[in-house]
Amino acid sequence: MANLYIGLVHYPIMNKHKEVITTAITNYDIHDIARASITYDVSKYFVIHNIPAQRELVSTIMEHWKSGFGSTYNPDRKDAFTGVELVNSIAVAVRTIEDIEGIKPIVATTDARTYDNTISYARMREHLENEGRPVLVLFGTGYGMTKETMESFDYILEPIYGHGE
């Protein structure tokens, strides 16, 4: 099975007025997704943020849990942070995976809409099981990534609909 990587994208993101913005880092972005990544054997979790002050905040929080007081207070959280990497762009995340794996990853994302390159979860699983190329699944914040960014990816995972839709 190919390696799975995930990333949480904070730029370029749309706000509710369809303006391009950068979203702020939240605690959930760091702690909870890092722990879920370890649980589900994700190869690496990328926190993707373009603003240096926000990356510095994330670095400070991560260091607290990796080597500061938090590392002895809650060792499980320390372990979760071993798979987290802070980068300033999607392109850097892709290059990092390429450096690790020796091949460019398949890049997929999620959206509530369908696109020409929308793929089912079953088909994406086949890629992971059979193709051998690593897969980077990106998740947007705010009101989602810009259309131009979405169109640059290999695949968009099909929307998940609830009972009321």
Predicted regions and their residues:
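Helix-rich terminal scaffold detector
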Residues: 126-130, 145-146
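Short glycine-rich anion-binding loops that position phosphate/pyrophosphate groups of nucleotides
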Residues: 112-115, 141-144
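Generic beta-sheet signal
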Residues: 48, 110, 138-140, 159
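Short, charged, surface-exposed secondary-structure boundary motifs
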Residues: 118-119, 165
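RNA substrate-binding interface of SAM-dependent RNA methyltransferases
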Residues: 2-112
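Loop/turn-to-beta-strand initiation segments
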Residues: 132-138
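Structured adenosyl-cofactor binding patch, chiefly the S-adenosyl-L-methionine
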Residues: 143-165
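Charged helix-capping and loop-helix junction motifs
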Residues: 121-125
